[in-house]
A protein has these predicted regions:
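Conserved, structured C-terminal
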Residues: 1-178
């Protein structure tokens, strides 16, 4: 097997966590997260090839492209795209698929699609955000929360209550240079 032959080279089995770390750090999509069925969140439709950031690979000039008109119509209506982000500090809470992404004023502009620990030990992820937030270096706020840990509404908080605070992140290059 590959494991037997590769043992002397340090080959080891990896699971889904390894796959997710590698693809997320490389900026690659996973069906159901960054595109395809189940990728739409917060009342939005499922993400297509354009929203996933791969629209430039669609050959709309090919004469036999049956879905050309549907693809182009969807591209004209597209409001956002998947970007890669990074939390600049270690020790922050992991973001999960569906967690809200906010702008600096606290307005929801998208949602997390994936998040994993990168080779430098920082959390790196991908998120679908509105088009005006895709530039590298754009600051984001992410609510990395589990539904059971939302806490009381801010207006109902009392002394000693704990609330969730969004974690600062920044948009980084979608496909990092090697």
């Amino acid at each position: 097997t590959i494991l037997t032959v590769g043992e002397k080279f340090g080959v080891k089995p990896v699971g889904l966590g390894g796959r997710d770390s590698l693809r997320t750090e490389a900026g690659l999509p996973l069906y159901g997260h960054e595109m395809g069925a189940g990728s739409g969140k917060q009342g939005q439709r499922d993400l297509g090839v354009g929203e996933a950031g791969f629209g430039s690979y669609v050959k709309v000039y090919k004469p036999w492209f049956i879905g050309r008109e549907a693809f182009l119509a969807r591209e004209r209506e597209r409001k956002g795209v998947v970007v890669r982000f990074r939390f600049p500090e270690k020790g922050v809470r992991m973001a999960h698929n569906g967690d809200p992404v906010l702008d600096k004023r606290g307005r929801v502009i998208g949602w997390v699609t994936s998040c994993a620990i990168d080779s430098e030990g920082l959390l790196t992820g991908q998120a679908y955000v509105e088009r005006s937030y895709v530039e590298e270096g754009t600051p984001l706020l992410i609510y990395p929360s589990a539904p059971s840990e939302t806490g009381p509404a801010p207006a109902k908080m009392k002394l000693g209550d704990k609330g969730l605070v969004p974690t600062p992140a920044v948009v980084v290059s979608r496909f990092p240079k090697g």
